[in-house]
């Protein structure tokens, strides 16, 4: 049985069980390696500029901060979730053909796309927020690109049957608000609006 487990580790990098232990030492080591390689903290270019003000001691509720910046700060200050790069690696390695094209209709940050590009695949991500798309394309690895649009329009940006995998993480209701854009479902006022 131990030999069988070791073979699974060799074949799959992490044992492919129903529940994956992300606190495991090997997982954490891989995650650190990816984090070092990707150098991505989930911010946008605008947030990076805003963080300079934050580091000088300006607080969230300071009246000197313009209203739109207060909202952005409130939404993004240490409350952002980043897609685990090891999950990206495993999903690509386990379920996609080598050199495959992966699409994401709710792309968010650069992690999924850059992991897939680094592993030899290509990636097309659709993201609503213009500043996030600009930031992502600046930090993009060869083979990864982001397009500013609503994820519902993904077929306007890829050819039919051109993708080998859809890997996405749509927003949850009432957990994180990414923007106040009209077509951003993360800012839905109630669950009925969100689900429809």
Annotate each predicted stretch with a short phrase:
Residues 1-196:
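Class I S-adenosyl-L-methionine-dependent methyltransferase catalytic core
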């Amino acid at each position: 049985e131990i030999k069988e487990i070791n073979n699974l580790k060799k074949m799959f990098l992490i044992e492919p069980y129903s529940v994956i232990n992300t606190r495991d030492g090997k997982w954490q080591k891989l995650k650190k390696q990816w984090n070092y390689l990707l150098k991505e903290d989930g911010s946008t270019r605008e947030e990076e500029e805003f963080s300079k003000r934050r580091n000088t001691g300006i607080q969230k509720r300071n009246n000197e901060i313009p209203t739109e910046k207060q909202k952005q700060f409130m939404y993004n200050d240490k409350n952002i979730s980043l897609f685990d790069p090891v999950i990206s690696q495993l999903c690509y390695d386990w379920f996609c053909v080598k050199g495959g094209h992966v699409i994401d209709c709710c792309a968010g940050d650069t992690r999924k796309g850059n992991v897939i590009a680094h592993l030899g695949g290509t990636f097309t991500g659709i993201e609503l927020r213009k500043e996030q798309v600009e930031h992502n394309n600046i930090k993009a690895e060869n083979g990864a690109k982001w397009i500013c649009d609503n994820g519902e329009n993904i077929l306007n940006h890829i050819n039919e049957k051109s993708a080998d995998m859809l890997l996405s993480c749509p927003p949850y209701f009432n957990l994180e608000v990414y923007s106040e854009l009209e077509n951003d479902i993360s800012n839905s006022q109630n669950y009925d609006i969100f689900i429809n």
